[in-house]
Amino acid sequence: MPKRKAAGDASQEPKRRSARLSAMPVPFTPELKPKRASTSRKTKTTNVVEESKDAGATTIPETKPEVVKGECNMENAENGEAKIIEAPISKMETEEVKEQINEDTEGDGGEKKEAVVTKGKNDELEANIQDVEKDEDEKEHEDTGEEGEDGEREGGLKEKPDVAEIEDAKEAKDDEEKEDKEKEDDKGGDGKKEEEKDDEGEAETEEEVKEQQKEETEGDDGKCKVEENKEGRKESQHEEEGKEELHEEDGKEDLHEEDGKEDLHEEDGKEDLHEEEGKEDLHEEEGKEDLHEEEGKEDLHEEEGKEDLHEEEGKEDLHEEEGKEDLHEEEGKEDLHEEDGKEGQHEEEGKEDLHEEEGKEDLHEEDGKEGQHEEDGKKKADGNEDRKEEEEQEAATEGNDENKVEVEEEADNKDFKEDGEKGEPVSTV
């Protein structure tokens, strides 16, 4: 029979060993875990996507730390054995361990070394487990009083690190199994990925070949179209050039025809005037008139804007351009008396004055050369002095002389109207 302790000791401590051990707080020492021989870290060559997949696949359930109670749990004690309640390992520590495992497995040579080390550790742990079991069996059969109890206490304290080692060994085995499975999955996935990559590469090469063929055909068609467009443009340019040349030639012919018609009209008008008036002086001065006609033609070619001066309608344009519109407004209906009205009035009322002044017949012969013939008449009176100098000044003084003569004639016509129908014409000297 084991010896009993004193009453004072019994009141302080629980009676059974299991109750005493369960009441004692268990010190958690993570330093006791065996650290694996870590290899030199290499640069990570794995893709970030694969790492994220691995991290997502191994989800760790959250474990809440259980508070160690100091109460006596009699139900948990069986056959005098004490169940040691340890604080579970926190989540961060498990993640750190797995990170170390992943880093170690990245190297090619690191895998073999780890396998050898883990095998040796597993053997040692199994031997320790067997020793612990034997010790427990022996202690159960011992009934040696206080010494036995003291020995059991010391044994219990020694058992604690053994139990921690056992749990570490189990975790290591689980980790190894998981790693093996992951490697197999990775190998299978890599094979499938390589096959998919090969298929994609072949499809891409076929598409590239088709695109090159399309580009070549499009390039040939584009060249043909460009050449056709160039030929079409050249033909259109030739046609446009031919049309422009035709228009230029037609314009020149029209100009020549108009010039010829003007010359014919001038000559016809002169001949009619010569026949009606029957003046010998005009026949004597035909050579001079031809000179004036040639000079007038040169002026026409030099200044095309002066053709209106030599036509019947040119007088109206001169009056408008030279600022004599006010005269036309004030004096009334001068345009009626300018062209045909003037000739009619002069024929009816002032033919005697025209016959008296033979030197100014040329004014009524040519519409645009009245100033020239006036100067010619003066030349006859003065003895034909310096004919060349006057011819040079004719172009400048043509318009002014014509306008002066017309203004004088219009003033005369007004006088006739005011005085009534008088038979005495006013001279235009």
UniProtKB/Swiss-Prot annotation:
GO biological process, one term: chromatin organization
GO molecular function: nucleosomal DNA binding
Per UniProt, location of the Glycyl lysine isopeptide (Lys-Gly) (interchain with G-Cter in SUMO1) cross-link in this chain: K98
Main location: nucleus
Tissue expression summary: Expressed in trophoblast giant cells.
Cross-link (Glycyl lysine isopeptide (Lys-Gly) (interchain with G-Cter in SUMO2)): K64, K98, K121
Alphabetical UniProt keywords: Chromatin regulator, DNA-binding, Isopeptide bond, Nucleus, Phosphoprotein, Transcription, Transcription regulation, Ubl conjugation
Identification of the protein by name: High mobility group nucleosome-binding domain-containing protein 5
Native species: Rattus norvegicus
Origin organism lineage: Eukaryota, Metazoa, Chordata, Craniata, Vertebrata
